[in-house]
Amino acid sequence: VRILVWHGWLLEGSGSNVATARIVEVWRAGGHDVLLVCQERHPERYPWIDAWGVLDRDDVSTIEPNPNASDAPGRCVLLRPEIGTLLPVFVVDHYEGFEDVRPFVDLAEDELETYLRANVEALRAAAAAHRPDVTFVGHGIPGAAIGRRSLGAGSYVAKIHGSDLEYAIRPQARYRTLAREGLEAALAVVGPSAESLRRCVELVPQTTSNARVVPPGVNVATFRPRPRAEALREVADRLEQDESTRNGRPSALDAEVERALDARDAAAIVELFERYDEDVPELEAAARIRRLAHRDGPIVGYLGKLIPQKGVELFLEALPALRHEAAALVVGFGSDRDWLAALALALRRGDREAIAWLRDAGGLPVDPATTPDAAARVSDLTFTGLLDHRYAPGALAAMDVQVVPSILQEAFGMVAAEGAAAGALPIVARHSGLAEVAAALEDDVGRPGLFSFEPGEGAVYRLVDGVDRLLSLPARERDELRHAVSSFVGNHWTWERTAAKLLAAAEAEG
């Protein structure tokens, strides 16, 4: 099958980015011919990309072969549209190659139309060159409207997520109109969970007739239970060979964070973010992870972006109140990295005044009045920076408990599924698509509420109780649960199943 995919961003970092990459990889492995249109700046990092080029309006540059490409029955070519210096996003973060990264809701009308026009022209040119049998476009906006304007009604399958619904379509009527334009004309509309499709239909009722649930998946060959020490040593060994870490955040900045916190100098904390590359592992990540490999006690972890919407502050607040002596592992990247270092310091000190300042000056979603008192025992906290698909499976396999405290309405909760596949027992916020993931795992083991906590006021205490509940289980019972949740993911949530269901959705409506 000749497949065309439009995705507006990168291939790592967010759930939709990772999902796009994994699905295309599976299609290529299955013998399909895929043309992927996205903004990825480093296609050479992906062995499933055979070649790449640039789309400048309707002109395709010379296609360059990827020297790192692996053998496969199919083929994948990546084309990157030239869309200018503005990249609209749902949640602001740093994006290499773009000077102006702004939320969709902050765009002027002419900026939005310029962005849409550039992508419409690019997708139309890509379709003319590839002549696809089926086209998939990402997100309710902007992908669905780009699909309709470039290819016509009934010519594409639209994939919704969670961020498009909550950070563009819900808050602004113009995006509900734009979503309707694209979704009502789609061959099919697929979403990762029944809950995400319900929200979509609530906002855009015209999607009712052709909506289908297609859960995302996990690469169960790499995300699998492993002995902790072995997994961490392998991650450390690989990191020591990764030259990109030399540009990562150095531990020396922690002293500057402390000085800035003591001086209540917000500008100094902001400035630190410009002094390292957030898109790579931190400079001393290998040494930190190797130290963890020698620990005997439990490890409680978080993997995800370091931004307020993901709730990592809630995780840090919970750590001092745990009854169990556990090491904490924070895997991720994002603009709040140095603010989180300051928060961790304030929590260790039990300094509510500093916590209040971090809330007011840094915008951290913390409340000093509800923050648990600092315990005499302080958790060992390890930050690693970004650990991509090469490292994340080992980091997750090392976690006894994985916390997913997202504040954002998540479409599915893929990171929780990946952790479960690796044997990390999840404790997730019980809302949106995260609740569906937790409920499925809880039903499978016959333990309602075991893997979730209620969000909202007082959530930090319920999170503490949830983590302690899992850590209190006998070691043998925890091991049985680890293998149970891993087996469930392998039987129900794999990328092979996801890729097949997407093609089936297109064929059923075609």
Model-derived regions, located:
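A charged, aromatic-enriched C-terminal amphipathic alpha-helix characteristic of glycosyltransferases
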Residues: 15, 458, 472-506
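A conserved catalytic-core segment of Leloir-type glycosyltransferases
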Residues: 35-130, 234-238, 254, 259-262, ...
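Acidic donor-binding loop of glycosyltransferase active sites
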Residues: 187, 377-380, 397-411
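Conserved donor-binding/catalytic core segment of Leloir-type glycosyltransferases
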Residues: 190, 234-310, 316-319, 329-331
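Short hydrophobic beta-strand element within catalytic cores of glycosyltransferases
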Residues: 425-435, 439
